[in-house]
């Protein structure tokens, strides 16, 4: 059994109100509650439970599953663990004007690949 928890470095938050209009980071912080941003991992045998501080898109798990299988691990990624930093979706959807990708994606583009990379690296660390 092993456990890991670490803070995730993130960009400054913003909220998009139109395609080229964003609420400044200092205003975002004034109108929202601060939330911890960390990833946690619990490994029991060959099962790894990964906790994320976001609404983590299921579309991102294929690459994580592939890495876990190569390491002979089964993995379960969960959302809303310990904090909330908005939606983390596939990077290609960042500019899509939908609720999850436009309104609730608070930390800019490329977080899908960023989170997948962090989780894949965590899986390597625990094997």
Describe the residue ranges of each PLM region.
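Non-catalytic substrate/cofactor recognition surfaces at enzyme active-site rims
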Residues: 1-127
